Amino acid sequence: MDNLDLIADEVRKCQKCKLWKFRKNAVPGEGNSKAEIMFIGEAPGENEDIEGKPFVGVAGKLLTRLINEILGLSREDVFITNLVKCRPPNNRDPEEDEILACSPYLTRQIESIRPHIIITLGRHSTSYLFKKMNMKMESIGKVRGKFYTWNIYGYKILVFPTYHPAAALYNPPIRKVLEEDFRKVKEALSSKPITLDNFLYGSGDKGEKGNSNSGK
């Protein structure tokens, strides 16, 4: 099993795609190596590129508040990372070749941590994991707010898509939905394992209808 520090060192030295030419710092991710909850975003932004840490800008502050105030946890209790570990120029969307080159690091992180719940933030990380689960990705607004079961590495991970915090910064309705989604995760965490099935909708569920905003 990979050590997270080893993976992080590889990420910082990585030149597998063109993004290394533009970065100040690669951003491997950080948090608890035995976290029950893992957050996966899209890619680092300007602040993350400067500091080499995930979600430290304005969107990151919102994520931290949601973790603290709704989940009742600290950033040190969870693990936070991105699908792509280097900042795309001008914060553009990651390109397919960049995702292909970088995603093996994420796969190894998931295998090392073995979280109980993965919260995908926005359409890019959600789409990537849905492909891994052999599921069709609709808009983030349609699939968010539900748990999907991913049987991988010989055990079960619950994947929970929601909006990227950046999509909620200047959109009060999306922020409200994001907060509601975090409350669902809190409720699941507070439930006994036998009742957790109440929150599972399985791979056949397409998610409730919602705002079709890209949600980052």
Swiss-Prot record:
Name this polypeptide is given: Type-4 uracil-DNA glycosylase
Species of provenance: Saccharolobus solfataricus (strain ATCC 35092 / DSM 1617 / JCM 11322 / P2) (Sulfolobus solfataricus)
Role: Removes uracil bases that are present in DNA as a result of either deamination of cytosine or misincorporation of dUMP instead of dTMP. Can remove uracil from double-stranded DNA containing either a U/G or U/A base pair as well as from single-stranded DNA.
Residues reported in the UniProt entry to bind uracil: G41, E42, A43, F55, N82, H164
Alphabetical GO biological process terms: DNA repair
Domain of life (superkingdom): Archaea
Binding site for [4Fe-4S] cluster: C14, C17, C86, C102
Keyword DNA damage: yes
Quaternary context: Interacts with the sliding clamp PCNA3 subunit.
EC number assigned by the record: 3.2.2.27
Known catalytic reactions: Hydrolyzes single-stranded DNA or mismatched double-stranded DNA and polynucleotides, releasing free uracil
Keywords from the named record: 4Fe-4S, DNA damage, DNA repair, Hydrolase, Iron, Iron-sulfur, Metal-binding
Temperature dependence, free-text field: Optimum temperature is 65 degrees Celsius.
Gene Ontology MF terms in the entry: 4 iron, 4 sulfur cluster binding; metal ion binding; uracil DNA N-glycosylase activity
Family from the record: Belongs to the uracil-DNA glycosylase (UDG) superfamily. Type 4 (UDGa) family.
Database matches in Pfam families: UDG
UniProt-listed SUPFAM superfamilies: Uracil-DNA glycosylase-like
